[in-house]
A protein has these predicted regions:
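P-loop NTPase motor domains
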Residues: 1-84, 146, 155-161
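Acidic, low-complexity intrinsically disordered tails
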Residues: 185-188
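Conserved ATP-driven motor cores of ASCE-family P-loop NTPases powering translocation/secretion/packaging/pilus
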Residues: 66, 73-171
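C-terminal alpha-helical "lid" subdomain
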Residues: 174-178
Length: 188
């Protein structure tokens, strides 16, 4: 695309809800979108813009395509030079495993991305997810025991080799984008 971004604007959202059930369509849209985003991030004029944040929710769905997985891998590796902080969201660690068990190049890239992640924020996981999280993330016995006990809003932060339990506080302005249960609440 020749569409330019206003880097001083509020942000860009690429909504995938219309194609998220169609694997072929999702892959096609993501290949086009990631190519466009990468060219914008690497453009010389992007050197003079404020730092940016790239958030990819339901990262497991995006890592099924080798092209998209490699885009995201390059974004992580070039984050400092692009001035971008990358945030990947997966609601269950098992969702990432589903993308990494088939032995494909995309699966290997996906596991590499996980291994390269320097900051991991883990909210409560059900007991049946803990062994998988422990294996994939290299959790200690203590960290694994904490995961199913975390209360809402509390997370296990792993930054490098340091660990802390952190209470997250969400302001009223942030709640609208953080409340993933809002569609279920009929009172709103």
């Amino acid at each position: 695309s020749t569409e330019r971004l206003d880097w001083t604007g509020r942000g860009v959202v690429i909504g995938l809800s219309a194609v998220h059930q169609d694997t072929a369509a999702l892959t096609a849209v993501m290949i086009a979108a990631t190519g466009w985003l990468q060219s914008l991030l690497a453009a010389p004029e992007s050197d003079h813009v404020p730092r940016r944040v790239q958030v990819l929710e339901e990262i497991w769905a995006l890592l099924g395509s080798e092209r998209v997985a490699k885009y995201y891998q390059s974004c992580q590796k070039l984050a400092r030079s692009y001035g971008v902080a990358n945030i990947s969201v997966a609601h269950r660690i098992a969702d990432l495993r589903a993308q990494s068990d088939d032995g494909t190049s995309a699966a290997k890239v996906s596991m590499g991305i996980l291994a390269d992640t320097q900051t991991q924020i883990l909210f409560r996981q059900s007991s049946d997810q803990v062994s998988e999280a422990t294996e994939m993330l290299g959790l200690s016995t203590y960290q694994a025991q904490l995961l199913p006990q975390l209360v809402r809003g509390r997370a296990l932060w792993r930054v490098g080799d340091r660990t802390a339990v952190v209470q997250h506080r969400i302001g009223s302005a942030e709640w609208a984008i953080c409340d993933t249960d809002q569609r279920l609440n009929l009172d709103r």
